[in-house]
Amino acid sequence: MTEYLLSAGICMAIVSILLIGMAISNVSKGQYAKRFFFFATSCLVLTLVVVSSLSSSANASQTDNGVNRSGSEDPTVYSATSTKKLHKEPATLIKAIDGDTVKLMYKGQPMTFRLLLVDTPETKHPKKGVEKYGPEASAFTKKMVENANKIEVEFDKGQRTDKYGRGLAYIYADGKMVNEALVRQGLAKVAYVYKPNNTHEQLLRKSEAQAKKEKLNIWSEDNADSGQ
């Protein structure tokens, strides 16, 4: 719409200039010619003002929402915040080590993975030894990954490995997140939460709250004083 008005304004300016030319050629013929000259000049000035205003409006509309007509972003107007989406990657099981640790073949290389945001009772700790519900957690994870036809890993937005070189990820067995399944069964706590590696934190906390409500395994009454 602005482009059409701009074109009309330019046409008006041309007509006004022609009228002024006619008025100048007849200015000596009398009072009416002088009035005609004044009218034509006024039309030209008004037209130039309108054209200038429309031109500014057209330029502004080209950067509406921070995007030029060409489709490129104008960084002075709009700055988009990039959001990295999580995606799953295929892997192959080598073995389950304990409740929250598995060894996988990932991108052609063997790699040990530590499940993000969860902590299961120990079974192989040099000082803690075997903790209550540790064997159950290990058996649960082992069953999930060994019975799965498809294993996938999903890294979060932050660092991908810990200080021991283990991958930090959500592990999926046939589409089911092992991390969440452990928490839901009361075999793991939500732990080691560090931003930005906490995309699924609320999902896990919701599952943990339900496990507590149902007093499952580490949240059971007979385990209340065990320090779990």
Swiss-Prot record:
The gene is nuc. PANTHER family: EBNA2 BINDING PROTEIN P100, SERINE_THREONINE-PROTEIN KINASE 31. It is an enzyme of class 3 (hydrolase). The active site is at residues 114, 122, 166. Its EC number is 3.1.31.1. It catalyses: Endonucleolytic cleavage to nucleoside 3'-phosphates and 3'-phosphooligonucleotide end-products. Disulfide bonds: none annotated. Keywords: Calcium, Endonuclease, Hydrolase, Metal-binding, Nuclease, Secreted, Signal, Zymogen. Binds 1 Ca(2+) ion per subunit. Ca(2+) binds at residues 100, 119-120. It comes from Staphylococcus aureus (strain N315). Residues 24-60 form a propeptide. GO terms for molecular function: endonuclease activity, active with either ribo- or deoxyribonucleic acids and producing 3'-phosphomonoesters; metal ion binding; nucleic acid binding. Pfam families: SNase. Belongs to the thermonuclease family. Enzyme that catalyzes the hydrolysis of both DNA and RNA at the 5' position of the phosphodiester bond. The keyword Nuclease applies. Its cofactor is Ca(2+). This is Thermonuclease. The keyword Transferase does not apply. One of its GO terms (cellular component) is extracellular region.
